[in-house]
Amino acid sequence: MSCDLHIHSTCSDGAVPIERLASIAARTGLHAIALSDHDTLLSAQYAYAHTGQDGVELIPAVELTGYDFERQHRVHLLCYYPDIDCPALREHCAIMKERRNACALQSAKELEQLYPQFTTDLAWETTKASGCLLYTSPS
């Protein structure tokens, strides 16, 4: 049985919408994939709701970002079959989403300064379906 236990979708920094991952995995011969997006429970919720799709087992997972203060660097922890109702886990994901939003908004504003054809509103329209960013237009 072949599987990939670390796959990202557009719920975090992946390029493929979560709904299409199983069919791609099936075409490549995988029997199971773990939907392990960064600091969001969206992919785990999807996997719990769609345990098997296109003949591929969907394993609920989340990749949690943490910090190793002793070694002074960021770490990523893969968590399989997370309790999506756990208050501490939900709070961690909410905090990380706020940080990601602030960083994305700052990056978008910097891009607007460099490239007049780029607008934060256009970037928001392109990415809002992912559910990963919470941008409110100033207009």
Residue ranges and their predicted role:
Residues L111:
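Conserved, mostly hydrophobic/aromatic
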Residues Y135-S139:
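Conserved small/polar residues in nucleotide/adenosyl-binding loops
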Residues Y48, V62-N101:
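Active-site phosphate-binding/coordination module
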Residues M1-Q72:
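An N-terminally biased module of ancient metal coordination in phosphate/nucleic-acid-related enzymes
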Residues P116-K128:
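Short, surface-exposed acidic
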Residues R20-I24, P82-P87, L114-Q117:
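Short amphipathic alpha-helical segments, especially helix-boundary/capping motifs
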